[in-house]
Amino acid sequence: MKFGIIIILLLQFVFCVAQDTVFLTFEQAVSIALNESYTIKSHTENKTAMQNYFMYHKAQFKPRLDFNLYSPSWNESVTQINRPDSLPVFNSTGSLRGGGDLSFTYILPTGGNLALHSIIYQEQLTTNLESQGYNKLTANQAYTKFGISFNQPIFTKNTLRENLQEAEYQYQRSSNYYTRGQMDIVYNVTKGFYALYRATREVEINKEKLENSKEAYRIARLKLEAKRIAEAEVLIAEVEVEQDKARLSESISNKEREKDIFKQLIGLNLEKNIDIITNIMYDTFAIDINIAIEQALTNRLEIEDAELYKKLREIDVDRAKRERELKGNISAYYDITGLGMMNDPNTADLFNKSFSNLTERPPNRGITFTLSYPIHDWGRGKAKVAQAKAELRDAELEKENIQTTIVREVRDIVRTVKESQERLKIYEKNQELAITSYKVSQLRFENGDITSQELGKEQERLSEVQLAYLNAYITYQLAVADLKRKTMWDFREGRSYLIEVNSE
């Protein structure tokens, strides 16, 4: 029996060692969340996506080199041959081609392009003539082509530059969203941290309450043995003990629940055992509401984001107007072509003949100037412009509303901080008085001046005051954190949090 007990104790010890507890301060929790949480990873991926979207459009202004290889390209098919004054015949034709093409395209700053291109391939041709009893003809040819081409849209906006501007605005918005997301993470970690702290303190308060009720029950039994109180008083004290045990068990379960929520919030494995370290001391600071509003309007990224959104809508208006504008295009090309054909399939001879033909054959060349204008579209273009302008006006209204909302939020949070600060001082004093009052009640109970039921009420009152102080403390800390988030300003140090967040 003793050996079994020893084994059980050893197993419990090993289990406890394996489940090492990680103690976290608030600063450590924030640091983990800003690197490991789902939210920051999601914001990072979104920012990376927009950054690459911007880099893609930026790269549109750089040259590109393209190569296509078709080796082999083979096909056989029936081809209809129409004959004058006779019925058509259907010949079977086939080709086997091997080669490729290479092109170099230089993007002009004006949105056009200048391209150099070359094509070279060898092809074996076959034809089965229906009119000659499907007599088979074969030929081998080599084809070479070198040329230059030019294309330039005119009388319209540079769409490449416009797309780049749009991508840049989108990237700036994603960067702002990432920065705001960091501040939101800090605030949410603050909420989660103090929610876990509340659950931890509730366990401690309920443990203290249970110890007090056990002590009251012990004293009641001694009084009963001395025949100083009735047995009913002891039963009441015993009921208080059992009720406090139930409350303690419930608060322990709630603490574990809050631990899991907090671990998920900051990005820790749910299997990891954690506990928090906090200092319940708090400091106060002066808040100038005018400075708070000024800094919020300067630092809050929602205003910049609204301005970027307005610029995107301006681009939409320009695009809508182009549906009905005069457009033009200039294109030109010049190339030389060489063709070598012979029955001998010798590749070297074929290409020598093709290269010689480059100088013999006249070049291909051309230039085209086109204009297009929608004369009448039955209101489609006009409606699209009206839609884009309405969305632009809505974006302007949204920016104005955001500025008003920021001012209102700052005024409200400044009031909340001041109110919670005063309330915290009151509850702190109440807690000191309640502790003193309960100690006096314990002495009165020991002296027989009050009943166990009256002592239980005093104990309940002490717990309520302790929880009220805890809630007031947490409310104040959350209000201060919300003030930081909504002003992006450190009132203690007199500096902007925006610089600190961007440096990270």
PLM regions: where:
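Acidic, low-complexity, intrinsically disordered peripheral segments
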Residues: 17-19, 30, 66, 75, ...
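Periplasmic alpha-helical coiled-coil/stalk elements that build and connect Gram-negative outer-membrane
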Residues: 24, 165-169, 175-295, 416, ...
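Small/polar, glycine/serine/threonine/aspartate-rich low-complexity segments that form flexible
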Residues: 69-148, 277-286, 318, 331-373, ...
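Amphipathic alpha-helical coiled-coil segments
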Residues: 42-57, 181, 185-205, 222, ...
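N-terminal signal peptide c-region/cleavage motif recognized by signal peptidases
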Residues: 11-15
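A glycine-/polar-enriched beta->alpha junction
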Residues: 31, 35-41, 48-65, 101-128, ...
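Positively charged n-region of N-terminal signal peptides that target proteins for export
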Residues: 1-5
